């Protein structure tokens, strides 16, 4: 009998301990979650895009997709065909304040969860877009505008969500506008080649969008960011804008152009784009990575090195020579064109999405947009080739 009683007492004690542990866990975890949410709400710079309803932000888009039903569901509004004209709109997005880089668990569906919810989409006429966008620009502390161009395989709904996520994590008090081109041409080799052709053709509509922004919205500071094959859209847009005497002469119209993991052919970038870039952009930053597996596949398909692919390693002289080849378009001591290797900090799953998943990248990007000079940070190191061409390496620090 004492043995049974002792067993019952032990069982009761263990049960009480388990309940106490569970209670403490829920208490502290709940408190931690509440503190994180309160902190996220307290420390947020995005004010100009914020709507009166807490946690809802307004962004804008221009697209050259063929409209299907612009008043229908999100998935059914635009197709994957290119139109030689533009459609405009605004999208109001609810963003949970605790959403962060560490929450990228499943890249195939994380944008569809409750952290980023598209609450309202409106089609805008050109004049209304200019009016609403200009109002945000004039209310922003920098009188700035960030334009975003996404890359290969991006559908319209995910392009909207990724733009909202980018604005949230970058957290600059600036209006944000998406240029959405039909990059969703399929995942096969044929789809990739078809998307590359569409990207080249879409340069015309991006050029028209940039001209609209520069002439009518008139931000003091215009920032243009393109990822992956979106870089090809930018290159072809610059080809078109450069033919206009107003854009070909000084001063430059774009303060900062940023290309991340750019899927752009080196020869085209070096030959034509170099002079066009000087005329149109005051600063150009190209983020590259040697472990960008997606671009290695692109290289095999295109039988040439793509712009986003790097082999930088300061401990390896042969790789330094390859870096010099990549930097052929740079002039000695050139500070307008900056090459940044993110290999040491690129921890992403397919090594191609560092522009959405790497904290050090966002820290560096924030400084490049908000500062007027080249940033100097503890994580950023610069190297120089024997020909005095400078490039940068972004590290995790010490």
Model-flagged regions — what are they?
Residues 1-19, 24:
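N-terminal Sec-pathway targeting helices
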Residues 25-122, 131-140, 160, 164, ...:
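Lipolytic serine-hydrolase domain surface
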Residues 143-144:
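Alpha/beta-hydrolase fold active-site loops
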Residues 147-151, 261:
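The conserved beta1-alpha1 loop
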Residues 150, 227, 352-353:
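Histidine-centered active-site/metal-ligand motif
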Residues 154-159:
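Short substrate-entry loop that stabilizes the transition state in hydrolases
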Residues 206, 226, 230, 234:
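Gly/Ala-rich beta-loop-alpha elbow adjacent to hydrolase catalytic centers
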């Amino acid at each position: 009998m004492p043995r049974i009683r002792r067993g019952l007492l032990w069982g009761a004690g263990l049960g009480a301990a388990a309940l106490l542990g569970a209670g403490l866990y829920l208490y502290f975890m709940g408190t931690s979650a509440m503190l994180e949410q309160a902190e996220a709400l307290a420390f947020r710079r995005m004010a100009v895009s914020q709507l009166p309803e807490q946690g809802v932000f307004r962004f804008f888009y221009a697209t050259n997709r063929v409209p299907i039903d612009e008043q229908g569901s999100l998935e059914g509004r635009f197709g994957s065909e290119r139109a030689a004209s533009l459609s405009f709109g605004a999208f109001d997005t609810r963003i949970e304040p605790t959403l962060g880089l560490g929450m990228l668990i499943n890249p195939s569906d994380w944008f569809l969860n409750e952290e980023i919810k598209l609450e309202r989409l409106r089609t805008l006429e050109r004049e209304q877009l200019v009016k609403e966008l200009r109002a945000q620009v004039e209310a922003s502390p920098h009188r700035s505008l960030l334009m975003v161009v996404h890359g290969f395989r991006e559908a319209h709904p995910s392009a909207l969500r990724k733009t909202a996520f980018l604005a949230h994590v970058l957290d600059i008090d600036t209006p944000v506008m998406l240029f959405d081109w039909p990059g969703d041409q399929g995942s096969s080799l044929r789809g990739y080649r078809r998307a590359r052709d569409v990207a080249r053709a879409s340069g015309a509509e991006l050029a028209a969008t940039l001209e609209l922004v520069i002439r009518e919205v008139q931000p003091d500071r215009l920032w243009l960011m393109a990822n992956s094959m979106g870089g090809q859209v930018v290159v072809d847009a610059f080809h078109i804008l450069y033919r206009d005497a107003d854009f070909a002469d000084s001063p430059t119209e774009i303060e900062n152009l940023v290309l991340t993991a750019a899927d752009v052919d080196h020869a085209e970038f070096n030959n034509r784009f170099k002079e066009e870039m000087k005329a149109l952009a005051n600063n150009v930053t190209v983020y590259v990575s040697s472990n960008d597996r997606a671009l290695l596949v692109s290289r095999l398909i295109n039988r040439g090195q793509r712009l986003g692919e790097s082999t930088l390693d300061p401990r390896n002289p042969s790789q330094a020579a390859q870096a010099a080849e990549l930097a052929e378009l740079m002039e000695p001591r050139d500070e307008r064109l900056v090459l940044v290797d993110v290999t040491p900090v690129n921890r992403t799953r397919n090594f191609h999405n560092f522009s959405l998943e790497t904290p050090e990248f966002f820290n560096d990007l924030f400084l490049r947009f908000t500062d007027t000079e080249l940033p100097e940070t503890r994580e950023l190191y610069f190297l120089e080739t024997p020909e005095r061409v400078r490039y940068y390496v972004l590290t995790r620090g010490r």
